[in-house]
């Protein structure tokens, strides 16, 4: 599992935006945000996406430990790089979208070192919850002032083994490791 995550985000922002203090609540722009994944399919890759439907992000630019992240994904809207994979992905042997239409992540800790951050939390897939760690990077829009934290892009990345969540269908053809990238476009809640 990958290590650095939200801690990096928080530390980068703390260095870039020293004027603000305390946790700041952010709202998600779901239309501009994405969750993508890839896994091995023999010598090829299966790629896809799952809609990001909700996020509760509270970022403290002076104390990473005060940051919290909660995210929900719509499994029923999952897509993949070819039709059979999309159907199989949502089926009972993999994500079982009918029985488990939502996937969630809730942070339990945020740490940082230098300009890197790690968010550790609980990921729930198919009703099974396991701890995972994600790396985080935070970006301001080009041309924005260094002190402007009103709109940000947060990029989270990590890896999970689908078998850890009981998603074992087609294991003879499809890799166990799934690489995930979440790009969340957020703005300060008013």
Residue locations for each model-derived region?
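Bacterial N-terminal signal peptides
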Residues: 7-18
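Positively charged n-region of N-terminal signal peptides that target proteins for export
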Residues: 1-4
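Low-complexity, acidic/polar, glycine-enriched regions of mature
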Residues: 20-190
